[in-house]
A protein has these predicted regions:
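Non-catalytic macromolecular-recognition regions in eukaryotic signaling proteins
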Residues: 1-159
């Protein structure tokens, strides 16, 4: 919290009716997503999938740096996630400012989750099952890695 100057809110957020407000402890400067399998002819295993996906993240950075301004409807402001700024970009387009104070939830697995989400803009044509690896580089230069095995699909609304 101190690294982002998030030290002055000092208010009760909820009585259990609101989701827990949490952000990653790290701020990030770079994101790369790769697969262990060939995606298509242009994306062999191990290469960046930057041009076949977008990332949706939510940040509370603006809310904190603007002095925690919630207006007069504080409960609704928090309940509706109005304190979060939504960013949707290709990984290579994300800036360090975009990836500062990234929100996450350990309990929200809905399609409307505010946690980071990868959205595919094209489906793989060679291999169907992929182990995707996300590498997030912190502003200090440390690399955080997570992998998941899945069968990527494109949301029909994007086609």
């Amino acid at each position: 919290a101190a690294r982002n100057n998030d030290i002055d809110f000092n208010q009760v957020l909820a009585n259990g009716a609101l989701p827990m407000v949490a952000t990653f402890a790290d701020n990030f400067s770079k994101m790369v997503v790769t697969s262990n399998a060939d995606w298509d002819e242009a994306h062999p295993a191990g290469t960046s999938l930057d041009d076949v996906l977008q990332v949706r993240i939510n940040s509370s950075s603006d809310f904190v740096h603007d002095g925690y301004d919630m207006g007069e409807y504080k409960y609704e402001f928090l309940q509706n996630y109005d304190y979060l700024k939504t960013i949707e970009k290709r990984p290579s387009e994300l800036t360090a400012a975009d990836m500062k104070m990234v929100y996450y939830s350990l309990t929200d697995f809905s399609s409307q989750t505010k946690s980071p989400v990868i959205v595919f803009t094209s489906a793989p044509t060679l291999e169907k099952e992929h182990t995707l690896t996300l590498r997030w580089t912190t502003v200090e230069g440390d690399v955080k890695t997570a992998s998941v095995t899945c069968t990527p699909e494109v949301d029909p609304a994007l086609q």
